[in-house]
């Protein structure tokens, strides 16, 4: 179902700009122009949801809401919601290449609150009508999300399972009480979501008009502290106190003797099946309205997932439990039609996972950055690919190509040189990109860092390291016409 194509992986928070973090303003449109000049058809991003502690897009307060950090202030000035004076002398961080999330948190929300107060006192009836329409169309998730965020602030940012018992359990009287008490806060968060989706939908429309599709991302699990978990406790494995019975993780392996303890709540798949997986159907539906294609993270968890007893400090005592399998995807497909989905099928693969991916028809993933272990044959080398896969030079979880090459064992470096017919180490990233683009994979994608030949300083995430992630930003002016022409030439040669 996917045409031969290529694209760039680049999350909007990493866009350059003057407000400390990438936004959905003019730099987003300039990046789409760069994609078009480069003859790219795909822009891949991370999940767009609101981020919390650790700033990871993969641990969001909602599977449906948008990240307020991405709202562009210049567009709010154009809409007469803020003035240039409001933004004068505000500290958004002092390094244009790294996001200072503390500064963003401290400055962004007061400015968005000011925009909301200006909106309330304005006579912009057209925008007020648009907000009411937005609330109606998105009520299935928005009502719970805006109440959840308002409650979270009310309870000093505590996770929902530490709130007062009556509202933690969503008792009717408590729900009504807090909806009344926090009414203005709730409307403020409705307004923020309205702004986000207005700006995002305009960006997406511009991309589509220029022949570019956006690939979004769905983490399989939701965050423990999320409106999803608070508002839908029946679809998770919680006890009577709304504490998880078991949580998600990954078993011990060659890289980790204790495995990985992710801590996300696990789904009650039996309960979900009773509703024909309606929550998952709505989640996919929402993501396919904000993006054109979606990558589903940890696809193997739909075949079987590692369930760890709640309270354990490592993942050692977990066990495999069966996922919903093809039944889930049949239910989604029967309600939404053909599914433009990429299956993230990395990690521990079994025949059962391979069979499930083949039954869905979804393309899996190949990571070229994993291919050059000289000690063993592996299926990340391009000559092993089939058409129904997506090749990445790297993802958010691994080092840049140049960073990998600088740290790799010499025999692995030499294997990469030999395999890619590389004549100069300072061109290794281009030789790897050529290897991906020339392959039979239906889609080829490279992080923007690899096109620029950046090293480990531009790595956006190091799994298992708690701080310093998701901060990297692109410098202004590095996406040149010369770079676009070089990418375009490669793309034309290999009919992408």
Q: Where do the language-model regions lie?
A:
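Asp/Glu-centered strand-loop micro-motifs enriched in Gly/Pro and often flanked by an aromatic residue
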Residues: 1-4, 9-37, 192
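Alpha-amylase-like alpha-glycosidases and glucanotransferases acting on alpha-linked glucans and related
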Residues: 2-4, 11, 55-193, 197, ...
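Catalytic domains of carbohydrate-active enzymes, especially glycoside hydrolases
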Residues: 26-51, 290-291
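Surface-exposed amphipathic alpha-helices with a cationic face
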Residues: 36, 200-208, 333, 357-358
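Domain-scale activation on soluble regions of proteins
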Residues: 37, 167, 174, 472, ...
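Outer-envelope exported proteins of Gram-negative bacteria
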Residues: 46, 213-215, 219, 293, ...
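Conserved, well-ordered alpha-helix/loop/beta-strand core segments that scaffold catalytic motifs
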Residues: 189, 194-222
């Amino acid at each position: 179902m996917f045409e031969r194509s290529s694209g760039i992986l680049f999350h909007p928070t990493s866009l350059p700009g003057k407000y400390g973090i990438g936004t959905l303003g003019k730099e987003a449109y300039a990046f789409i122009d760069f994609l078009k000049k480069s003859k790219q058809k795909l822009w891949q991003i991370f999940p767009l949801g609101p981020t919390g502690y650790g700033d990871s897009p993969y641990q969001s307060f909602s599977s449906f809401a948008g990240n307020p950090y991405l709202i562009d202030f210049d567009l709010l000035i154009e809409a007469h919601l803020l003035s240039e004076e409001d933004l004068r002398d505000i500290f958004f961080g002092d390094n244009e290449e790294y996001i200072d999330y503390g500064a963003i948190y401290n400055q962004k929300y007061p400015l968005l609150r000011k925009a909301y107060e200006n909106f309330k006192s304005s006579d912009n009836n057209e925008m007020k009508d648009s907000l009411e329409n937005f609330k109606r169309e998105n009520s299935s998730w928005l009502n719970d999300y805006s109440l959840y965020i308002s409650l979270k602030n009310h309870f000093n940012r505590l996770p929902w399972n530490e709130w007062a018992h009556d509202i933690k359990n969503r008792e009717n009287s408590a729900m009504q009480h807090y909806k009344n008490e926090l009414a203005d806060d709730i409307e403020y968060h409705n307004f923020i979501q309205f702004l986000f989706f207005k700006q995002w939908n305009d960006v997406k429309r511009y991309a589509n008009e220029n022949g570019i599709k956006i690939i979004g991302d769905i983490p399989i699990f939701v965050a423990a502290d999320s409106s999803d978990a608070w508002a839908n406790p029946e679809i998770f494995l919680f006890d009577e106190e709304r504490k998880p019975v078991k949580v998600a993780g990954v078993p011990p392996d060659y890289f980790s003797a204790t495995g990985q303890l992710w801590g996300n709540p696990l789904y009650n798949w039996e309960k979900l099946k009773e509703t024909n997986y309606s929550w998952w159907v709505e989640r996919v539906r929402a993501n396919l309205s904000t993006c054109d294609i979606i990558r589903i993270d940890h696809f193997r968890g739909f075949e079987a997932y590692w369930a760890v007893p709640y309270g354990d400090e490592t993942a050692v005592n977990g066990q495999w439990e069966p996922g919903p399998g093809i039944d889930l995807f049949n239910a989604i497909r029967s309600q939404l039609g053909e599914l433009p989905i990429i299956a993230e099928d990395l990690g521990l693969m079994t025949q059962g996972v391979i069979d499930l991916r083949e039954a869905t028809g979804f393309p899996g993933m190949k990571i070229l950055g994993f291919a050059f272990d000289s000690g063993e044959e592996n299926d990340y080398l391009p000559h092993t690919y089939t058409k129904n896969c997506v090749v990445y030079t790297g993802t958010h979880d691994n080092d840049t190509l140049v960073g990998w090459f600088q740290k790799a064992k010499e025999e692995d470096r030499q294997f990469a040189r030999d395999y890619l017919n590389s004549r100069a180490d300072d061109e290794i990233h281009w030789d790897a990109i050529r290897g991906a683009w020339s392959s039979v994979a239906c889609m080829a994608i490279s992080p923007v860092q690899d096109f620029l030949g950046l090293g480990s300083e531009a790595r956006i995430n190091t799994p298992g390291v708690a701080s310093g992630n998701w901060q990297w930003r692109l410098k202004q002016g590095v996406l040149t016409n010369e770079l676009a022409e070089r990418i375009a030439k490669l793309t034309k040669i290999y009919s992408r």
